[in-house]
Amino acid sequence: MMMKKIFTLALAAVLAGTALASCAAKGFDKDGAITVISREKGSGTRSAFIELFGVEVDDEDKTVETADITDKTNVMMTSVSQNANAIGYISLGSLNDSVKALKIDGAAATVENIENGSYKISRPFNIATKSDLSETAKDFVDFILSDEGQKVVEDNGYIPVASTGAYSGSKPSGKISIGGSSSV
C-alpha cells in the first residue's frame, strides 16, 4: 500500500445550511412538514455534516430516516430552491441566490465569520496524493498552492490558505487524474 501525503488546504468549505428559512418566505407553510434533504452515503459533504452536527452514532448517520437523498450539490440546491419547506446543506462555494444560508448561533455564513470562528460549521478541503508524484502532478499541486491557484480558490467562493508565492512551475505536459468532492 502506497503512503499518501495530505496537503491540508484550509479552504474551510463551509457547510452552509440552505433553506428558504424565513416564515415570511414566499410559499413557506409554518404549519407544514419540513422536507429534509441529505446527500448520499459516501459524500464528503454528508460526512462533514453528520460529524459537525453530532448526528453520527456508531458510524451511522442519524440525521432523519425520512430524508430525501440527492447525489450532487446542484440537485440539493434545486430540490431546496423548489420547496419552500425544504432544508439541506451545501458548501459555501456553491451558495448562490437560489437558496439562503441559515445563521448558526446568530452568525451568518460569511468568509469573515468563518475566519474569525463565529460561524462554527466549516471543514477543510484536502489534497491527497500518492507519495511519489509525477512532474506534472507536482506542478499542478504547486499551482494550487501558489498565489494564482489560491486566487482561483477565492474566486470560486472558498477560503484560500496562505500561498507559497507566485507560480513558477515548469508547465510540463502530461496527464493527471483528479477525483473527489462535487463541491470543488
Question: What residue ranges belong to the model's regions?
Answer:
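Positively charged n-region of N-terminal signal peptides that target proteins for export
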Residues: M1-L11
